[in-house]
Regions:
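Sec-exported extracytoplasmic/periplasmic mature domains
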Residues: 55, 59-62, 146-154, 214, ...
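C-terminal accessory segments enriched in acidic
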Residues: 27-44, 48, 219-223, 227-245
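Bacterial N-terminal signal peptides that target proteins for export
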Residues: 1-12
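Mature N-terminal segment immediately following signal peptide/propeptide cleavage
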Residues: 27-82
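Bacterial N-terminal signal peptides
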Residues: 10-23
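Second-shell loop/turn segments in exported
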Residues: 37-44, 127-134, 210-214
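Surface-exposed loop and adjacent secondary-structure segments within mature catalytic domains
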Residues: 70, 79-85, 91-101, 112-121, ...
Length: 245
């Protein structure tokens, strides 16, 4: 039987809908990827797992794009996820161009700056676990990315992402993240569980890696400050820390 043009178009549309819904349904939540819930008692994801999860999510969703922004002291790649609508992600270079023009009021005339501000998108940088023992932020980063791309949020994520590009760095200190998780896993379930490592959680600087922000000696600091002061000039920078026992 010969198909009519209308039937052919209908079948094509249905096929595209099925393919699109299949891609959305295939977005893997962190707990399924890790085999445990994020934040579950006595369970921590290390940097290798966190990086692998972001890579998987970027393969499954058109709302996230990954970049390598540098390397840690021990040569772990430092990743950053750009999260927004597919349309916004396709124009990242334009949004960067606008932030560069708006970064200094001496560079761009007022009228042009107003037009650029109207056209551009708000850039929000979120960095996690600068201090590696404050482990919750790096763990949370996976859930945050998943919730934003799937819209499983208490706010309208789709509406927000129309106007915002989120830059998410899941770990500011990948080496320290790995050290902390390896140490905890080694002694979990023993009388030493919860004890501090007998060494600093950065190859050189330990807790003082945040105090490197005026010297820029460490490659991790250089990677993040390059995003801040040379690459993106975000309007908001949220550095996630942690308090508690």
């Amino acid at each position: 039987m010969r198909k009519s043009p209308v039937m052919t178009r209908t079948l094509l549309v249905l096929t595209l809908v099925v393919l699109a819904s299949g891609r959305l349904a295939a977005q893997t939540p962190p707990d399924k990827f890790l085999g445990h819930k994020v934040g579950e008692d006595r369970k921590l994801a290390d940097y290798t797992q966190i990086k692998a999860y972001f890579e998987k999510l970027a393969q499954e969703s058109p709302k996230i794009k990954l970049f390598t922004i540098g390397e840690s002291v021990l040569k772990k790649p430092m990743i950053m996820a750009a999260i927004s609508t597919p349309e916004n992600l396709a124009k990242l270079d334009r949004w960067k161009e606008i932030t560069h023009k708006l970064r200094d009021p001496r560079v761009t005339p007022v009228d042009e700056a107003r037009m650029l501000a109207k056209e551009g998108k708000a850039i929000v940088l979120i960095t996690c676990s600068l201090h590696a023992t404050e482990i919750a932020a790096s763990q949370m980063s996976m859930e945050l990315a998943y919730d934003l791309v799937t819209g499983k949020t208490f706010f309208d994520a789709g509406k927000i992402l129309n106007d915002v590009v989120v830059l998410l760095v899941p770990s500011h200190n990948p080496d320290g993240n790995q050290m902390v998780v390896d140490w905890y896993r080694k002694y979990v379930g023993t009388k030493y569980e919860g004890g501090s490592m007998p060494w600093i959680y950065h190859h050189y600087a330990g807790h003082d890696n945040n105090r490197d922000w005026f010297m820029f000696n460490l490659p991790e600091t250089k990677a993040v400050t390059n995003v801040l002061y040379h690459g993106w000039f975000p309007q908001i920078h949220l550095d996630e820390h942690q308090m508690g026992p």
